[in-house]
Amino acid sequence: MAKEKGRKLIAQNKKARHDYQILDTYEAGLVLSGTEVKSLRQGRASLADGFVQLDGHEAWLHNVHVPEYSQGTWTNHSARRKRKLLLHRVEIDKLESKSQETGHTIVPLALYFKDGRAKVEIALARGKKEYDKRQTLREKQDRREAERTISAIKRKQRA
């Protein structure tokens, strides 16, 4: 099988962008077994409840659901096992120091293949309060409304 070029998205954690304020993002490799890779190539994964935990000088991805490979035998993996993340030592140290602050956590944002290798985009994030979520939604709606009025004015000028 030839190596794929570019980025092929497998799963995205849209709820993380809604529930958290993203402060910093990192790209990390994943240590996977063979059946996990085959299952991911079928595009089956869920990042919904996932989180990253730092243990010593290692980063681990917890609670990410990669279903068992349908053609797998007794060598199949468990669906919600913890998976090791491959990051540089400097990045792990930076994440460890920043995640110790109150209200900060590390969440997965996206799972994808980049040049044939499985990668996960993780983010240092701060939890949003309910009023912050409403404020973000209001700003998004205001931006859309402004774009609509501008496009309507441009349409009238062309006619």
From Swiss-Prot:
GO terms for molecular function: RNA binding. Residues 131-159 are annotated as: Disordered. One of its GO terms (cellular component) is cytosol. It is found in: Cytoplasm. Keywords: Cytoplasm, RNA-binding. It comes from the Bacteria. Its main location: cytoplasm. Gene3D superfamilies: 2.40.280.10. One of its GO terms (biological process) is trans-translation. The keyword RNA-binding applies. Residues 131-148 have a biased composition (Basic and acidic residues). NCBIfam families: PRK05422.1 (NF003843), smpB (TIGR00086). Belongs to the SmpB family. Required for rescue of stalled ribosomes mediated by trans-translation. Binds to transfer-messenger RNA (tmRNA), required for stable association of tmRNA with ribosomes. tmRNA and SmpB together mimic tRNA shape, replacing the anticodon stem-loop with SmpB. tmRNA is encoded by the ssrA gene; the 2 termini fold to resemble tRNA(Ala) and it encodes a 'tag peptide', a short internal open reading frame. During trans-translation Ala-aminoacylated tmRNA acts like a tRNA, entering the A-site of stalled ribosomes, displacing the stalled mRNA. This is SsrA-binding protein. It comes from Streptomyces coelicolor (strain ATCC BAA-471 / A3(2) / M145). The lineage of its organism: Bacteria, Bacillati, Actinomycetota, Actinomycetes, Kitasatosporales. The gene is smpB.
